[in-house]
């Protein structure tokens, strides 16, 4: 069951769904519009062979950058890891499906299918892909990520690698997980 504005506001009011900082305009008709944070991550190197199965950490592969002059510039046919301004805390029976706002998609931007798990807590780090041949500018504080909330049947507690993340978080290595 997808949650509409009224149900989302009830979850926020009763403390089940946490959003910090919170402004009511973040709550839309059928989801949340989260805002761009102040930092982003891009690859520090190009033309490297990256094998996630051989890495314990990937921090050395990325440069974490503060938005200069209030702008994040995503080069053509490239991507950046962005973080949300908001720190969210999801209930154990609500999941979030992430999409880019359609206006931004019309400029050639996209995000891969991304789910916010039940019980997740932290800033959302998400890959924003520039599929266009142009440089596209995003600005901290602008609404960019639309999150559709749905109730799950039963509850689950998130125990993943990214619990409690703050700011933009590069991927974790997969060493030990691959056969």
From Swiss-Prot:
UniProt keyword terms in alphabetical order: Hydrolase, Nucleotide metabolism, Nucleotide-binding
Domain of life, per lineage: Archaea
Pfam families referenced in this protein's UniProt entry, alphabetically: DCD
Residues reported to bind dCTP: 101-106, 117, 165
SUPFAM superfamilies: dUTPase-like (SSF51283)
CDD domains (alphabetical): trimeric_dUTPase (cd07557)
GO biological process, one term: dUMP biosynthetic process
Enzyme class: hydrolase
Molecular function (Gene Ontology), one example: nucleotide binding
Enzyme Commission number, as recorded: 3.5.4.13
Catalytic activity: dCTP + H2O + H(+) = dUTP + NH4(+)
Active site annotation, chain numbering: 127 (proton donor/acceptor)
InterPro entries, per the entry: dCTP_deaminase (IPR011962), dUTPase-like_sf (IPR036157), dUTPase_trimeric (IPR033704)
Keyword Nucleotide-binding: yes
Pathway: Pyrimidine metabolism; dUMP biosynthesis; dUMP from dCTP (dUTP route): step 1/2
Quaternary structure note: Homotrimer.
Protein family (similarity comment): Belongs to the dCTP deaminase family.
Function: Catalyzes the deamination of dCTP to dUTP.
Protein name, as recorded: dCTP deaminase
Gene: dcd
């Amino acid at each position: 069951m997808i949650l509409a504005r009224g149900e989302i506001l009830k979850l926020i009011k009763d403390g089940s769904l946490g959003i910090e900082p919170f402004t009511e305009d973040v709550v839309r008709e059928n989801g949340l519009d989260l805002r761009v944070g102040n930092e982003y991550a891009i690859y520090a190197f190009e033309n490297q062979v990256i094998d996630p199965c051989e890495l314990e950490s990937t921090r050395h592969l990325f440069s974490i950058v503060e938005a200069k002059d209030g702008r994040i510039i995503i080069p053509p046919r490239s991507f950046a890891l962005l973080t949300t301004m908001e720190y969210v805390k999801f209930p154990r029976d609500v999941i979030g499906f992430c999409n880019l706002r359609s206006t931004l998609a019309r400029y050639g931007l996209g995000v891969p299918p991304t789910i916010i798990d039940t019980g997740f807590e932290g800033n959302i780090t998400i890959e924003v892909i520039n599929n266009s041949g142009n440089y596209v500018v995003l600005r901290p504080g602008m609404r960019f990520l639309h999150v559709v909330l749905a109730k799950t049947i039963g509850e689950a507690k998130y125990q993943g690698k990214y619990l409690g993340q703050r700011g933009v978080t590069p991927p974790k290595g997969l060493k030990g997980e691959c056969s």
